[in-house]
Regions:
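Conserved helix-turn-beta segment immediately C-terminal to the redox Cys motif
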Residues: 17-19, 34-55
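A short beta-strand-turn-helix
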Residues: 2-20, 61
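Structural microenvironment flanking redox-active thiols in thiol-disulfide oxidoreductases
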Residues: 55-63
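Mid-chain, well-packed structural core segment of small domains
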Residues: 64-70
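Short pre-active-site segment immediately N-terminal to redox-active cysteine/selenocysteine motifs
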Residues: 17-18, 24-28, 71
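Non-catalytic, surface beta->alpha helical segment in thiol-disulfide oxidoreductase systems
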Residues: 71, 77-106
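Conserved Rossmann-like nucleotide-binding pocket used by diverse enzymes
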Residues: 5, 25, 51-53
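Conserved redox-active cysteine motifs that mediate thiol-disulfide chemistry
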Residues: 24-38
Length: 106
């Protein structure tokens, strides 16, 4: 699982050769901790298709502000330097998978 920082964001996300699924999360967020295992499994399952990474809400305020994150967990899917879509507080692994499939199909 990729830990994404402000300093590495351009290379790790915007210039990536595959789509990047980003989880904006925080250690103090119980829902973030609850959905983390599903996010990790999806990241492993889709490793050939995309890169999965996490941005810590408390440690990366510039990225939080840049993307207007006010609710966590928020997942964003990036491709070719652009945000393709986002989902707030996905309820399950199936919801994350559906988000990926629907967003990449656009």
């Amino acid at each position: 699982m990729l830990t994404i920082t402000t300093n590495r964001f351009e290379n790790d996300v915007l210039r990536a050769d595959k789509p990047v699924l980003v989880d904006f999360w925080a250690q103090w967020c119980p829902y973030c901790r609850r959905i983390a295992p599903a996010f990790d499994k999806v990241g492993e399952q889709y490793a050939d298709t995309l890169i999965a990474g996490k941005i810590n809400y408390d440690e990366e305020p510039q990225l939080i502000q840049r993307f207007g994150i006010d609710t966590i967990p928020t997942l964003m899917l990036f491709k070719d330097g652009k945000v393709l879509g986002s989902i707030v507080a996905p309820g399950s692994k199936a919801a994350i998978e559906a988000f990926i499939q629907e967003t990449l199909a656009q």
